[in-house]
Amino acid sequence: MFALIDVNGMYASCEQAFRPDLANRAVAVLSNNDGNIVARNYLAKKAGLKMGDPYFKVRPIIERHNIAIFSSNYTLYASMSARFAAVVESLASHVEQYSIDELFVDCKGITAAMSLDAFGRQLREEVRRHTTLVCGVGIARTKTLAKLCNHAAKTWPATGGVVALDDGARLKKLMSILPVAEVWGVGHRTEKALATMGIKTVLDLARADTRLIRKTFGVVLERTVRELRGEACFSLEENPPAKQQIVVSRSFGQRVETLTDMQQAVTGFAARAAEKLRNERQYCRVISVFIRTSPYSVRDTQYANQATEKLTVATQDSRTIIQAAQAALARIWREDIAYAKAGVMLADFSGKEAQLDLFDSATPSAGSEALMAVLDGINRRGKNQLFFAGQGIDNSFAMRRQMLSPDYTTDWRSIPIATIK
């Protein structure tokens, strides 16, 4: 048996967690550069906001319903996600973090102590008590069925936020009323293709010929069909495979037109990518930089390019990665262009045990690991407490986040103050 715990409106819920005054108010969160709606709580959905709505188009709705709007605060969301995971891991032995707001749990052995429904309600209550985040819990024989149960738990209030189904008849009833688009991994194209075969509900898919499904759509959807029948094909991934690449990129708050500004942006991206690389305990040999204009601008000259530098010795040193990124940028930079986005990608990873080739002349910088450890240690106490001069200080091109909330959980200066009167 598997449980899926999914936070309701994660980003919006995180914003409400430290603002009691927003408890009964509609809340929504915007994408990068305050462009589109990417998260809403129940009241914001009820007011008519939809995922992907451009902010400038729905401002009348926002003002009419007094909806609280926030810029995306990824530092806060990541911190709250870690707290959410820690609470669940304190109650379950085998946990897989599927996304920032979703966790799978192996429920093996749980029924010896309590019912699955009681376990689901305990998970939900403990998460709410320790984080204030409200989640839905779905429990079933397979991960795919647990996803469906979770959908039911979050859709119908009468469930109390928990649906645990091990009964064939009740599962069939649920599958018969859900459209096939609700199945984990079934996208819009697959949904349309299945409809031409007369498969419109989840139950229709569960009853489909697995050989035909495999021949038409591939082995993954065939396994999904088997999962809908109660056969576990997707196991829990407690230790996800190591990343094969790291990408740090941003759309600029305003167009970048000077080499100095672009160099500062690329330095910042490279420094952040190197930090992520060290968190993964990996080393890289390949550093790529890409820059591009906006494909939607009809007035600007269109240009997009990418360059790659390959190192002789794998590294995780920010200085080396920044230097390589700047070399790559120099090869593709063009003047008199209004750039809308840039990014840095690291690839060709290896572990610390990677050795120099016999004929390698380069050697790692002395004291590199110790220096990077000091850098990361200082920055754990506050973002960019210590940064590279090449990143600049006043970045006019920085991502636009005019409604950014404080970093309540990671910055001492942002800890909420309670006043007793």
UniProtKB/Swiss-Prot annotation:
It comes from the Bacteria. One of its GO terms (biological process) is error-prone translesion synthesis. InterPro entries: DNA/RNA_pol_sf, DNA_pol_Y-fam_lit_finger_sf, DNA_pol_Y-fam_little_finger, DNA_polymerase-Y, DUF4113, Rev_trsase/Diguanyl_cyclase, UmuC. Residues 2-187 form the UmuC domain. GO terms for cellular component: cytosol. Keywords: DNA damage, DNA repair, Plasmid, SOS mutagenesis, SOS response. The keyword DNA damage applies. Pfam families: DUF4113, IMS, IMS_C. GO terms for molecular function: damaged DNA binding; DNA-directed DNA polymerase activity. Involved in UV protection and mutation. Belongs to the DNA polymerase type-Y family. The mucAB operon is the plasmid-borne analog of the E.coli umuDC operon. This is Protein MucB. The lineage of its organism: Bacteria, Pseudomonadati, Pseudomonadota, Gammaproteobacteria, Enterobacterales.
